[in-house]
């Protein structure tokens, strides 16, 4: 079973995340930010992951630390749960429509950290979440998981729909990338390591 539980405590946040790649063993999300909870729930549901997130952050300051640190720990969970990455597909690309919006996320579980984020989020706040922290979340996940992550909105108007499209596409792209293919011997790289 590919799974991980990681705790991270700083003066700004206390976070514990449990991730199960192979079984949708339950989804429980509590970050203290309703909109972030909603997005992580969508991510786990559409990625078919078991995900438990418990976070207490300094929301009296702002949502930045909670959002970024949640991304860090989620990325660390993916890295740990994937282990040596034997037999995984490695790549995933998904387009997800949300009414007038179309989002795309592509990932490469390459061992190299990189984020390309191309989404104009015109509404500065969604519930308790500053929309500028959406990019911070994806950067934190990409760097902690050591993966390439490209997230973009091809078109759309509603900021909620844009962010929701990206989180759903991220879940589906990660599902594709972590899937074990019995035809892949070792790791999916000519280098022999990823």
Swiss-Prot record:
For this protein, the record's Gene3D superfamilies field holds:
Imidazole glycerol phosphate dehydratase, domain 1
Which InterPro entries does the protein's record reference? Answer: IGPD_sf (IPR038494), ImidazoleglycerolP_deHydtase (IPR000807), ImidazoleglycerP_deHydtase_CS (IPR020565), Ribosomal_Su5_D2-typ_SF (IPR020568)
Q: Tell me the enzyme class.
A: lyase
- Taxonomy, superkingdom: Bacteria
Give the catalysed reaction(s), semicolon-separated: D-erythro-1-(imidazol-4-yl)glycerol 3-phosphate = 3-(imidazol-4-yl)-2-oxopropyl phosphate + H2O
Q: Which key words are in the record?
A: Amino-acid biosynthesis, Cytoplasm, Histidine biosynthesis, Lyase
Query: Where mainly found?
Result: cytoplasm
Q: Which GO terms describe its molecular function?
A: imidazoleglycerol-phosphate dehydratase activity
Q: Name one GO cellular component term.
A: cytoplasm
Quote the EC number. 4.2.1.19
Q: In which pathway does it act?
A: Amino-acid biosynthesis; L-histidine biosynthesis; L-histidine from 5-phospho-alpha-D-ribose 1-diphosphate: step 6/9
BP GO annotations: L-histidine biosynthetic process
Q: Where in the cell is it found?
A: Cytoplasm
What family does the database annotate?
Belongs to the imidazoleglycerol-phosphate dehydratase family.
- Name the record gives this protein: Imidazoleglycerol-phosphate dehydratase
- Identify the species of origin: Lactiplantibacillus plantarum (strain ATCC BAA-793 / NCIMB 8826 / WCFS1)
């Amino acid at each position: 079973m590919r799974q991980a539980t990681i705790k991270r405590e700083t003066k700004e946040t206390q976070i514990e995340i449990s991730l199960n790649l192979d079984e949708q063993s339950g989804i429980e999300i509590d970050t203290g930010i309703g909109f972030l909870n909603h997005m992580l729930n969508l991510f786990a549901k559409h990625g078919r992951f078991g995900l438990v997130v418990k976070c207490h952050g300094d929301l009296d300051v702002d949502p930045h630390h909670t959002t970024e640190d949640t991304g860090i720990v989620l990325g660390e969970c993916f890295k740990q749960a994937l282990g040596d990455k034997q037999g995984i597909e490695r790549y995933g690309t998904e387009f997800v429509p949300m009414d007038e919006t179309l989002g795309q996320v592509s990932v490469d579980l390459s061992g190299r950290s990189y984020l390309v984020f191309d989404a104009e989020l015109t509404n500065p706040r969604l519930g308790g979440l500053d929309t500028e922290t959406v990019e911070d979340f994806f950067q934190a996940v990409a760097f902690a998981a050591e993966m390439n992550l490209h997230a973009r909105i091809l078109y759309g108007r509603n900021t909620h729909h844009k962010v929701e499209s990206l989180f759903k596409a991220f879940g589906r792209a990660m599902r594709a990338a972590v899937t074990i293919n019995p035809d892949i011997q070792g790791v999916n790289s000519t280098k022999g390591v990823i």
